[in-house]
Amino acid sequence: CRYICPLGAALAIPSKFRLFDWLKRRKECGNPCQLCAKECEIQAIHPDGRINGNECHYCLDCQMTYHNDNKCPPLINKRKKRGKKAADPQLIPAVEVSDA
């Protein structure tokens, strides 16, 4: 289907004329993270993290993972770092102010 189907070839033509790339990627996508590439049923995501527009069916499964704080490894790492920074809260003493 990927190489022989004329419908697949016809669907790949509009991707050649894209004005902008609207599928988001992070610098961590591809190396070290391969989660989206493993989840892509079409295998349109290269090992380096680039999405092949000619093969992508725009199912947006990779984008669901990209924006999921509980699934995307770079977002999980950022959340853990934020949690470590906020782990030691500083207590501010309260002072009662009178209406005098």
Swiss-Prot record:
It is found in: Cell membrane. The keyword Cytoplasm does not apply. InterPro entries: NosR_regulator. It is a peripheral membrane protein. Keywords: Activator, Cell membrane, DNA-binding, Membrane, Transcription, Transcription regulation. The keyword Transcription applies. It comes from the Bacteria. Its main location: membrane. One of its GO terms (molecular function) is DNA binding. Transmembrane segments: none annotated. GO terms for cellular component: plasma membrane. Transcriptional activator of the nitrous-oxide reductase gene NosZ. This is Regulatory protein NosR. The gene is nosR.
